[in-house]
Amino acid sequence: MEASLKEQLYEARVAQKPKDRDLKSMKDRLASMTFKSGNTESMNNPVSKTRLIEMYDKMKLLQWPKVKDQLQSRSVQSKVVQGLIQETFRTAAGEANKKKQQIEEAFGLNECSSGLSPQKVKEYRQLTVQNLQMALFHTNKEELLKSGFPELGGQFSEEVMENLRPLTSECYWLSCLMALNNPPLQPDWKNLVPSMDPWDIFPRNITSASVM
């Protein structure tokens, strides 16, 4: 009787092994699909390309006009503000790219020593960047700006900076999120269409950089 039970258990384990392999293979395929950047986006992802563009448009169309009115009342020049906004986006993207490069370097070492396949290393690397992106999404925007760009706006009075701070914090935060997207995104400053309104300083379009 005991021998029969052992034999049945052994046969059950043998029969289960292919199922376990199939389950692992399915999980790996699903994980791989999650990391594909292509045109597929998760509707629940708060930092998807679509959501990032929506946040940029909302800032440009709703937040910026209020700040612009305050700055105009203080006789601030639009060109100076435009330069500040561009520098904020540029600096934030640079800081985000540094962090991404550090992740690249760390996973480059892991690829040599871990024995994982290049595809698996790429997936883990992308997941780490996505986790960083989500962490920044939930970060206090003004604190992020202070830590990453402490010298911002030194040429302005405290009153003007008080008006600008919510906007520059939003720009810095959003630029970090855009830079960590796959592919990276940024406002299309190179093709900024001249406007009759000198205060129309934000590009209409978002451009994609090369894939990570």
Specify the residue positions occupied by each region the protein language model found:
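Extended, amphipathic alpha-helical stalk segments that mediate dimerization
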Residues: M1-M212
